[in-house]
Each structure stands twice: as C-alpha cells, then as structure tokens.
C-alpha cells in the first residue's frame, strides 16, 4: 500500500498534525451547521428536519438514561454533542480521499489514535471532576477503598484501563475501515476489468463502515456515560 504522511507544523517545540487539526475543525463545523439548520423555526409539534434533530436527541437520551438516572438531564447536551462529533468524525473519511504528492489531506480524525486518546482523557477528566463536584474530595477518594482498602491498586488500574480501552476500541475500528477502503481503491488500478468490481466492493464497504461508525459512536457515548454515572452515583451503589 502506498505510504502517505500528514503535513505537520511545529509550535513551541510541539509537532501538530495539520490534516487532523483541519479535519477535526471541519467535523465541529459540520456538526454545528447540522444542529443550526435543523433547529431553525422550532415548533411545539415537530415536522421535517426538526423531527430528525429530536429523534437523534431522544436516541442519545435512551443511551444515557440507564447509566445516569436522575443526572440524565445534567449531561444530555454533552452526550448529544459527543455523539454527533464522534459519528461525523468516524464517517467523514469515507467521503473522499485528497492526496497531494505524498501528503494525505483528508481522513477521519478518529482514525488517528492521538485524537481518540485525547477524547478518552477528556472523558476521564470530566468523570473525576464531576465525581468530586457532586460528593466532595473526601467521599470521592474513599470510594477507591471500596469494598476494602486492599482493592485500591485494582481500582486505580481500572481507571487506567478504562481510558486505554475506550480509545483503542474506537481507533481500531475506524482505522481498519480506512485501510480496507484504501486497499479497495488500489485494487481498481490493477486492470480496467478490476475497476467495476472494486467500485461495487467499495460501495458495499462504505455502507458497512457507516453502520460500524454509528455503532462505535453509540458505544463511545454509552461507555462515557457509564463511567460518569459510576462517579456521580457513588451514594447509590449500595442500594
């Protein structure tokens, strides 16, 4: 498979991936424009595009409610925005491929492990912050000693593995999808007879990838709210 690289720039000694930065900003813009377009002229009885927006919001509520319980409304907008971002980020790389010489200029941000790890770290920070905010530092830290103080190392290890597994699950699925699609595109170059076969296979793979991308956005939000729910519902664990 032909090797391409993403253009980078250094700032204050830190190397930034320009393709990932621009694609991430584009994902945010697309998600914002979608919400802006579907939320214009809201009516009590929704019709048309407002139905689409409310259906997605209700779908996200259905994901998070079992995990957050009475705190569902507190985090519903965060979960909604997170779902939109991850879903669009997962799928944007399927639209096209832009390559200038050896530089790749178009990709799914979530096909980059740094992005997924960053999202997972953000989730971890929110979880700890909300746990401390809801219950105070003493009660929050005491929970790491449950059910016994001997479980402290395992509880700390669980926090680390949550971050790693959340990021690796998303990265592995999206990156693998882009690799397979790139291989199918290169298959079309073998001969003129391979082009229609590669096209059909690529269309089928894109459809399957969209489905997988939706599942991964669902799982990411589900696990995120599961982790948050465990932190904010400390006082209900024993009930």
From Swiss-Prot:
GO cellular component terms, A-Z: plasma membrane; proton-transporting ATP synthase complex
Which CDD domains does this entry report, sorted A to Z? ATP-synt_Fo_a_6
One Pfam family it belongs to: ATP-synt_A
Q: Which UniProt keywords apply?
A: ATP synthesis, Cell membrane, CF(0), Hydrogen ion transport, Ion transport, Membrane, Transmembrane, Transmembrane helix, Transport
* Bilayer-spanning residue ranges: 18-38, 75-95, 112-132, 166-188, 203-223
GO molecular function terms listed in the Swiss-Prot or TrEMBL record = proton-transporting ATP synthase activity, rotational mechanism
Provide one Gene Ontology biological process annotation: proton motive force-driven plasma membrane ATP synthesis
Q: What is the membrane topology noted in the UniProt record heading this document?
A: Multi-pass membrane protein
- Record localization: Cell membrane
Which PROSITE patterns does its entry note? ATPASE_A
Q: What quaternary arrangement does the UniProt entry report?
A: F-type ATPases have 2 components, CF(1) - the catalytic core - and CF(0) - the membrane proton channel. CF(1) has five subunits: alpha(3), beta(3), gamma(1), delta(1), epsilon(1). CF(0) has three main subunits: a(1), b(2) and c(9-12). The alpha and beta chains form an alternating ring which encloses part of the gamma chain. CF(1) is attached to CF(0) by a central stalk formed by the gamma and epsilon chains, while a peripheral stalk is formed by the delta and b chains.
**Family indicated by similarity:** Belongs to the ATPase A chain family.
The free-text function statement in the UniProt record for this protein reads: Key component of the proton channel; it plays a direct role in the translocation of protons across the membrane.
Which protein are we looking at? Answer: ATP synthase subunit a
